[in-house]
């Protein structure tokens, strides 16, 4: 086991602060409509120019191990916020830095870190409740377009395309982002279905960069039971191999020698195959398998049909134009089912929704309806250069996630205004414990920082702006950093998804609070690599 080195107390906190500052200072320059670009060096290919906070954060590794610990924790804030809400990564990073910096001042003045953290957590809960009160539901296309435009770094073209996509597939439909072969960014809508089951083995992956298994024109075997014995599968595998087409297996599970054999044959290139677990459970699983069968024109091989796996023919298998499987989801695009059968199935599910009394059943039926009727929208992103394409694709990805978040939890005024207004609720809190009160004050002050940073990046003084807007009763009243004017943010179309703002604050407070309670840092002492002596002359290439 490698030897460790340790630092304690103030020295540890100083190291953490240095790490937080290095990462946050690189990320926060991208915040707001006039945020700056960051250029990232790549080992292969051209450098990437980006204004996406999480892309910048992911690239940062620091040489000092203690500083790097802090940087990795802040990176986690950005990544987690991006995963959950799709946007707000820079805001989350800025808030983490602000909460940690203010918290260190409290600790240096003798406050108990545990009580300070409790105060921070209490304040965050109050602000989240306040955000819910400020939040408004998304009612029309205009708001969807505004959210998408802002999340795509104020690009109205992307905003319009995403609004079109949401309109065509609905809020429950699937929107994927791909690279276009031309310089144009276009929207394609394809009938399709997605369910939340990923590949059973990463060895099925065909695109290592995206960690996806992509099957073009595959056959689809839909089986209700587990597959453990490869002999059961062999007849259908042999038939599929003769057609030279890939195969997607959807079953309760594929395990043991059956899975091992599929993996080996896939790696050797004998058969392009991918196995996934069937979606749902119990009777609902049977219904979902039937949905997939109708969509793809196949037969769901269920126990009550009395068909054995060995006797399955090619005409019982479903077909599709394309199947994309990642570690969490399977998307079937262009199912070759009979349109009349699909329509009849949709009507059947609609009738079930009308007659069911259970809210849970209704929700699950609506999910199935969306999967059958929604389809898949593909946004093909185009640009003049590879560097611009990568940057634009990142922005479109962000905007799609943020738009879905807006539909889910509603919208609040943007530009850092919502969190600033919500923090006013903390003024009414009377906390007897002085250390907890300090924690509440820390969050109140931190909530001003995103607004200040947006203004600073646009060349304005944030403190002056806060003084001008703080006493105005209209919660939507704020500062448009793009034009330098004071406006009603919602009317001006400057809005953020509530989920983005909420997630950014919760994640920032969680990590910053955790770092404040740290008293000791432990890192490995790196051993010096000894240079190996050169090989003997004349015999260097010989094996013995």
Curated annotation (Swiss-Prot):
Cited CDD domains: GroEL
Which SUPFAM superfamilies would you find in this protein's record? GroEL apical domain-like, GroEL equatorial domain-like, GroEL-intermediate domain like
GO CC, any one term: cytoplasm
Domain of life from the UniProt record: Bacteria
Q: Tell me which InterPro entries the record gives.
A: Chaperonin_Cpn60_CS, Cpn60/GroEL, Cpn60/GroEL/TCP-1, GroEL-like_apical_dom_sf, GROEL-like_equatorial_sf, TCP-1-like_intermed_sf
- Keyword Transferase present in the record's keywords: the answer is no
One GO process term, biological-process aspect = protein refolding
Residue positions annotated to bind ATP are 30-33, 51, 87-91, 415, 480-482, 496
> Which reaction equation describes what this protein catalyses?
ATP + H2O + a folded polypeptide = ADP + phosphate + an unfolded polypeptide
Q: What is its main location?
A: cytoplasm
The places in or outside the cell where this protein is found are: Cytoplasm
* PROSITE patterns per record: CHAPERONINS_CPN60
Q: Which UniProt keywords apply?
A: ATP-binding, Chaperone, Cytoplasm, Isomerase, Nucleotide-binding
Molecular function (Gene Ontology), one example: ATP binding
EC number annotated for this UniProt entry? 5.6.1.7
Say which family it is in. Belongs to the chaperonin (HSP60) family.
Task: Give the quaternary structure.
Answer: Forms a cylinder of 14 subunits composed of two heptameric rings stacked back-to-back. Interacts with the co-chaperonin GroES.
Q: HAMAP family annotated for this entry?
A: CH60
- Name of the protein in its database record: Chaperonin GroEL
From what organism does this protein derive? Answer: Sulfurihydrogenibium sp. (strain YO3AOP1)
